[in-house]
Amino acid sequence: MVIYLDVLIFENSIVNTFLLYITAQTLRIKVKMRYLILAGIFGGLYVIVLVIPTLKIFSSLIFKIIAAFLMIIICFRKKSLRFNIKALAVLIMYSMVTAGLCFFIELNNTRGSYFNAFIGNVSYKWILIAIMIIYMFVNRIIWFINDRKLTQSLIYEIEICFKDNSKFINAFLDTGNELREPITNLPVIVVEKDMVSGIKWDDCPKFYVPFRLFNGKAGNLEAFKPSYVKIYIGDKVEVRNAIIALIDNKLSSLNDYNALLSRGSI
């Protein structure tokens, strides 16, 4: 029997990527595709130990579990041992279900059977791999469309008003953002610095707003208080007092918005 190692690695990489993908969906964890694919390729390369006799020692159950655990680490990049063990259990469960499905198909894939007549000369493995690829591709498209709809529904046009002029900016309502300036207790609107580069705000009251990110990083944002801020919500216009904090980074990779509204702004 001739075994093409490159084809075997490719097939197993796709299957492992799919299993990790549905594991992430089950755990409701967002993962970056590059880490997902990298973990799938790592799992695909592990098949080498099954076909090379000198590496047979690494094909035992304990090494298979270690390889699966490393796939979890590469894919999810979580430090929590409890989460990684939970993810490993889900991955093993889906692997067993997939193996059982393949065994069932192979058992019923006999000459003259209805299943054999249905797929003809096409290998059932390639049909399953095609289904896995289509599922991941379509699911990502649906997720992207829904995410875009949600993002657009939370974008509002705001007008930052000064004594002599004003600036219109698209702002995203960050429902998890409760940032307030500690002295005035006013809500903070984070704005890209470039968006107010042409505005003379030197005469406005200056502040430094402390912040802390989820990764533990802390610091202070340079901020000022405009005359007022208008928030356009459908046909209504809300006038608010707020602090404008400036940030150097881009807030949207697609440039959908250039500011973040705190929950207390609306």
UniProtKB/Swiss-Prot annotation:
Tell me how this protein sits in the membrane: Multi-pass membrane protein
GO molecular function annotation:
aspartic-type endopeptidase activity
Its principal location?
membrane
Q: Which residues form the active site?
A: D174
Q: Which residues cross the membrane?
A: 36-52, 60-76, 89-105, 126-142
Please give the GO cellular component terms listed in this UniProt entry: plasma membrane
| EC number(s) on file | 3.4.23.-
* Protein's job: Probable aspartic protease that is responsible for the proteolytic cleavage of the RNA polymerase sigma E factor (SigE/spoIIGB) to yield the active peptide in the mother cell during sporulation. Responds to a signal from the forespore that is triggered by the extracellular signal protein SpoIIR.
Q: Which family does it belong to?
A: Belongs to the peptidase U4 family.
Record's protein name: Probable sporulation sigma-E factor-processing peptidase
Per the record, the gene is spoIIGA
